[in-house]
């Protein structure tokens, strides 16, 4: 399922105006925390002039889209005629504010009543979509990296359980599954789409055949969740090192010690094994100790 979603602006010179995003994962919309644009993409404000009878947009609505992608977006939304009324410079986004599509959803208990920041990011392209990317840092690595470098990790949500169901505390969607126990699509995606229609924030919907990650063990589809883990920082300097002690002279970090030990403390048979292990440790990120596995959680003691 693919959807085009309106994020209403709450502070700009136009009334009834929204930024439009496109996503293939409707279930991530409840966890949205930002909208991203690219300063190298040209944008415009478009007014809907005429539509087909079955269309979720209304005449007179204003939408901000990438100029290169606007025509295809309106085609998907069954808009017969739209005109560009203004170009948007990327610096203009610094003055814009938007809100979550579910901010006024009945029964939401103000769960989504927060300002959604508009941020600049190079992950946004003009290849497909709208020229904007909806950011759910709890469910996407690139989204997470954008929040990490801004020091925004406190904004992360944990709305999805290990079994792919929304947490019970979430209004409206609590308990709904993204995928069921048989690996088939659950009710979450469709319910999110229906609520977007209810709050008049769905521009269009469609279907797209694309690759999707699956478990190599069970062959079931996967979802991405940001969860708390224990890590070993392999590049952090180890304290209280007595450099006079020969046993502690292999380096000041775990990585340095491991690499030096490979060459000075280990005899290799065959020697090709040394290169494989050395290159792996030389480039590996911090070591996650608590990585969940099907058969258990190994922890170093």
Residue ranges and their predicted role:
Residues 1-31, 49-51, 95-97, 107-108, ...:
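Residue patterns forming the tRNA-binding/recognition surfaces of aminoacyl-tRNA synthetases
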Residues 34, 43-132, 141-145:
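Protease-associated
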Residues 37-39:
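Electropositive, beta-rich accessory/interaction domains or terminal extensions
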